[in-house]
């Protein structure tokens, strides 16, 4: 799986899947083939400035994956490892935290959106058609009065944030039920986002938290820490709790998830629609399964959606803080 992103040196913007910039017609230079080209916000720029000993706070910076960054059109490898081993982050903490306002400024944002607008609109159209077609198909094929109720599995991360908006726009319904699976291991910023910004931005969207009675650290003593090969935590802290919530629905759940194939080799094998899931009364649907990081961020910036604060600080994933899949 691959997706190419080009850099237009004239406009100073990434252009997705188009070597010729749609704005200025200049030929771009390829900067990514893995579909990763994420905006870097002021908070992360401050940290990066401390790491490399160079002020890039006012630079045009994009993250390309695997510790690779594009700084004013020049690729740089910026590794956190040695920085943390030397405990230099303790020295820089005050500099990073001072006046840490919500500055979402992205260089040449208008040009970036203009250059990629046709591309993202095609992705949006396809995803929304998938949602409406699936809902209609299940409604027409329902037997014995069994109905499927559209819901969104919401984690507070960028992918479920995008899926939430796509599903509600496609169905023209702000009242689609959202289930937030609280594993008790979320970043504080996730709770702030779910209980604050998301609710304020979407006052008519019900958010039902699913809480667990289990203690993660006590279970670690029983099963051992979760690993990529033994993720018992997902079953105990997410699946079982959500299953209890789904039982309260007046019908079965058509659950829309923010899962993408580009996230891992395991997920490359996923079907877009899973009619046989871990939860018997549930069908899983993944509208953005073939999207890449660059697509998700383009959508967020294009729609002007609020998002989890942790991304501003450089986190690439904002699920459980101790997740074994958090390798980048």
Which stretches of residues belong to each language-model region?
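Immediate flanking context of iron-sulfur cluster ligation sites
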Residues: 225, 303-317
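ATP-dependent adenylation/nucleotidyltransferase module used to activate substrates
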Residues: 2-28, 42-47, 51-302
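Histidine- and/or cysteine-centered catalytic micro-motif in compact active-site loops
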Residues: 260-262, 312, 326
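Short, conserved alpha-helical segments within structured domains
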Residues: 156-159, 315-319
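Residue-level signal for threonine
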Residues: 40-41, 187, 306-308, 328
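Short metal-binding segments enriched for Cys and/or His
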Residues: 28-34
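Local cysteine-cluster metal-coordination motifs and their immediate loop/turn environment
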Residues: 316-328
């Amino acid at each position: 799986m691959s997706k190419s992103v080009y850099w237009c040196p004239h406009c100073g913007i990434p252009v997705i899947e188009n070597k010729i910039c749609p704005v200025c017609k200049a030929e771009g230079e390829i900067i990514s083939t893995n579909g990763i080209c994420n905006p870097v916000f002021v908070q992360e720029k401050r940290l990066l400035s401390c790491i490399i000993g160079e002020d890039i706070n006012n630079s045009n910076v994009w993250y390309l994956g695997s510790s690779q960054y594009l700084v004013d059109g020049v690729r740089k490898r910026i590794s956190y490892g040695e920085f943390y081993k030397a405990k230099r982050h303790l020295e820089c903490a005050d500099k990073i935290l001072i006046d840490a306002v919500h500055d979402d400024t992205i260089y040449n944002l208008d040009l970036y959106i203009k250059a990629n607008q046709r591309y993202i609109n095609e992705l949006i159209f396809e995803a929304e058609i998938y949602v409406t077609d699936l809902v209609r198909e299940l409604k027409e094929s329902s037997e014995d009065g069994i109905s499927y109720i559209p819901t969104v599995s919401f984690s507070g991360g960028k992918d479920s944030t995008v899926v939430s908006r796509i599903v509600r726009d496609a169905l023209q319904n702000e009242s689609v039920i959202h289930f937030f699976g609280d594993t008790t291991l979320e970043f504080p910023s996730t709770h702030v986002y779910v209980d604050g910004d998301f609710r304020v931005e979407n006052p008519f969207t019900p958010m039902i938290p699913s809480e667990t009675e289990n203690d993660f650290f006590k279970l670690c003593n029983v099963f051992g820490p979760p690993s990529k090969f033994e993720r018992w935590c997902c079953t105990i802290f997410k699946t079982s709790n959500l299953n209890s919530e789904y039982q309260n629905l007046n019908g079965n759940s058509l659950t829309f998830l923010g899962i993408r194939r580009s996230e891992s080799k395991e997920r490359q094998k996923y079907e877009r629609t899973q009619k046989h899931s871990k939860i018997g009364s549930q069908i899983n649907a993944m509208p953005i399964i073939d999207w890449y990081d660059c697509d998700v961020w383009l959508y967020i910036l294009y729609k002007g959606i609020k998002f989890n604060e942790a991304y501003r600080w450089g986190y690439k994933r904002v699920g459980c803080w101790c997740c074994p899949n958090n390798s980048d």
